[in-house]
Amino acid sequence: MNVVQGNIEAKNAKVAIVISRFNSFLVESLLDGAIDTLKRFGQVSDDNITVVRVPGAVELPLAAKRVAASGKFDGIIALGAVIRGGTPHFEFVAGECNKGLAQVALEYDLPVSFGVLTTDTIEQAIERSGTKAGNKGGEAALSLLEMVNVLQQLEQQL
C-alpha cells in the first residue's frame, strides 16, 4: 500500500501570507501565530516569508491570485477576521472570501490555507486568535506546510 502523507518541515518553502487589515487587533495575532509556526515547526526562514497586506477579507482572493500567478511561492496563507453583525453582510463577505480563495488554489494548483476567522462574536474571534481556543493563524500555517509536502510527494510519485 502506498500512503502519501505530508510532514510539517519545509525548510525551502516560499510562503506568502495575505492578510487583511480590517480587525487588525485580531489579525495581527493570527499573523504572529502563522509566522511563529512557519519558523519553529516548518523551519522556514524569514527570507522565504512574504507578507501582503490588503484592506479587508473581500480583497484576500484577488491578492492571493496575483501572488499565485507570480509562480514564486509554494503556498499561501490567507488571514483575516469577519465578525457577524446585524446585517447579511457577514454571509456575503465570508462566503465570497472562502470561495475566492478555494478558486485560487484550484486554478493555480497551489495550497491556499484558510486562516480567516468567521465568528458570531468578538469574544469568539479573540479566543481563536491566540487565547483559549488556540491560534487559527498557527493552525493555518501547519495545514499549509503539510499540503506543500503532500503536493511535492504527489508530483514525485505521479
From Swiss-Prot:
Keywords, sorted A to Z: Riboflavin biosynthesis, Transferase
| UniProt pathway annotation | Cofactor biosynthesis; riboflavin biosynthesis; riboflavin from 2-hydroxy-3-oxobutyl phosphate and 5-amino-6-(D-ribitylamino)uracil: step 1/2
Which of the seven top EC classes does this enzyme belong to?
Answer: transferase
Is the keyword Transferase assigned to this protein? Answer: yes
| Database matches in InterPro entries | LS (IPR034964), LS/RS (IPR002180), LS/RS_sf (IPR036467)
**Where does this protein hold 5-amino-6-(D-ribitylamino)uracil?**
22, 57-59, 81-83, 114
Name the catalytic site residues. Answer: 89
A GO CC term attached to the entry: cytosol
Q: Does the keyword Iron apply?
A: no
- Annotated signal sequence is none
Q: Which domain of life is it from?
A: Bacteria
Where, in this chain's numbering, is (2S)-2-hydroxy-3-oxobutyl phosphate bound? Answer: 86-87, 128
The record ties this protein, via SUPFAM superfamilies, to: Lumazine synthase
Role according to the record: Catalyzes the formation of 6,7-dimethyl-8-ribityllumazine by condensation of 5-amino-6-(D-ribitylamino)uracil with 3,4-dihydroxy-2-butanone 4-phosphate. This is the penultimate step in the biosynthesis of riboflavin.
As for family, the record states: Belongs to the DMRL synthase family.
Q: What quaternary structure, including any partners, is listed in this protein's UniProt entry? A: Forms an icosahedral capsid composed of 60 subunits, arranged as a dodecamer of pentamers.
Name the record gives this protein: 6,7-dimethyl-8-ribityllumazine synthase
The organism named in the record is Shewanella frigidimarina (strain NCIMB 400)
